Design a protein with these regions (language model features):
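Ligand/cofactor-recognition surfaces for anionic moieties
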Residues: 1-182
Length: 182
């Protein structure tokens, strides 16, 4: 079960609980949008795969950016390089001489921690500074947006979902090393 399904079911549960739809209607909606949800999850997976591919190239070309990224994340208490079995500065230098950057599993660890750091920092922003509703709406399939617009706006995890969408959009496109000076 993906986070998309959980967040959708949470919203629909609130609709059932309030009496706006029945359990049968909820189940019908879930059946109708199953393919859309799967496609959305797969799109996110593709974007994360692209992030890792681009970060792999970036880490080969500029190992010092990845080193700086890991140091910043460590300084912020977000990353424990030793616990995550990530290379030391010396190991990165040796790899760079050999034309090697971080390996994809290592990049996935750095990307996850970078995303969590960006996400936490976005949550600290005052409400209204970011167009949260736009990102929240984009998270849900079109059929849900048109039928349950009010429920989306009232989603109990609306801000968190919106900041997750924004975090993924930024980091997946700009890379794990991009947003660390914020």
């Amino acid at each position: 079960c993906s986070d998309h399904e959980v967040n959708l079911k949470t919203m629909l549960f609130d609709e059932v609980r309030s009496g706006r739809i029945t359990v049968e209607q909820r189940n019908q909606v879930l059946t109708e949008i199953q393919q859309d949800v799967c496609e959305h999850v797969l799109m996110n997976n593709r974007e994360q795969g692209l992030l890792l591919s681009l970060d792999e190239i970036r880490s080969e070309v500029d190992p010092f950016s990845i080193e700086r990224t890991m140091m910043i994340l460590e300084d912020r208490g977000v990353l424990d390089r030793e616990a995550e079995s990530l290379p030391t500065q010396e190991e990165l230098t040796t790899r760079h001489v050999d034309g090697i950057g971080l390996f994809r599993p290592e990049l996935a660890i750095v990307a996850a921690h970078a995303k969590m750091d960006v996400y936490q920092r976005l949550l600290l922003q005052p409400v209204g500074r970011v167009d949260e509703l736009r990102f929240l709406r984009e998270y849900f399939p079109a059929a849900i947006r048109s039928r349950f617009a009010d429920a989306i706006e009232k989603h109990q995890l609306g801000r968190e979902i919106a900041m997750t969408v924004l975090t993924n959009r930024i980091v997946d496109r700009a890379g794990s090393f991009f947003f660390l000076d914020m």
